[in-house]
Amino acid sequence: MAPGVHPFDIPVLRDGLSFELTRPVTFLVGENGSGKSTLLEGLAWSVGFGAHGGNRDHQFTEATDGHALGRALRLGWRQRTTDGFFLRAETFYNFASHLEEAGSNFSRYGGASFMAKSHGEAFLALFEHRFEDGFYILDEPEAALSPQRQLAFLRILHQLTAPRIAQFVIATHSPILLAFPGATVLSLDDGSIREVEYRDTSHYQLTRDFLLAPERYFRYLFDDADGDAPGAV
């Protein structure tokens, strides 16, 4: 590692980090910029997936941050696997375009091109038809999923992990996904990586408090905005 050089200047990476994946599902939470996506890119590169998404067969232009961190990571395995997938919501279009250009047989993905589906439909088709045993790294999958489809994803997650045939590491802001039973939740805030309880996350607490009393939040947000407006008394 080169201290002070990006991405090793990210607080959670500055002094090195070590963690274990002891359960089938591990969630990473933290504010934007805390290092979640960079850590996932590094994991993906270390496993052999493209740092922009896909599996070992889908190598696109590498992301510098993920490449640098991936070279520094040292992974220990109980049973090493190269099967799996790295899903990034923001670059999923690149993966779908790659399949189109390669003339892929979409029977492996539910029978229809991803380009003929909505973003959320394409995600679920990938989850249902291509996720089996292996190591899966997902970066904010909720970005393309409505609340109802997030529930559908949780069902797929249960089907894959109940027999312990798959391992998932998922970065998310979704309190719905974070509620998955038996998952480990790791926070990357405050410059360290530590396990937290689902109900202790700001994602859960803020969503719960807002839904219970939205008017209180509107008063706080809008009164400040009105006070800053030109001509406000």
Model-derived features: positions:
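The Walker A (P-loop) glycine that initiates the GxxxxGKT/S ATP-binding motif of P-loop NTPases
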Residues: 30
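ATP-binding Walker
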Residues: 33-34
